[in-house]
Amino acid sequence: MAFIKKIKRKWQGREKWSVTAVTQGNPVSTKELCEYIADSTTASASDVYATLLALPKIMELNMKNGRSVKLEGIGTFRYKVSAAMVDKEAEAGESLIRDVRVQFTPERTVTAVGKRRITRRALIPDNIKWEIYDKPSKSKKTTEEG
């Protein structure tokens, strides 16, 4: 199950409540992913590990050469820049780039059901069960005397 927490925000001068997704515990490690993949394929965990370790460099090489990277069943990765603005087109160029990030877009499939079109994004199942995450309080532990 996935977790959400309640958050209070100000909107148009009034307090409103909403929720945001939160994670719990440590992220799933590369080693754990390799074991899951090896258990469900014919590849060994060490082969999967070597492949996953090579993936970022191969993706970087292709993206720095102007290509996006699409992983079937997962989605597409591409560079996204934030840049300063100038008044004249002649001044616009690489020197305006302040930050470069990787933009990820989950793969999308569209299915026609009668007259409706249903869009589904990779990595987002239809049946996520959400539970409110109650952060443990940071109060001091008390000991019982017997």
Give residue ranges: language-model regions.
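Strongly charged
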Residues: M1-A50, K57-G146
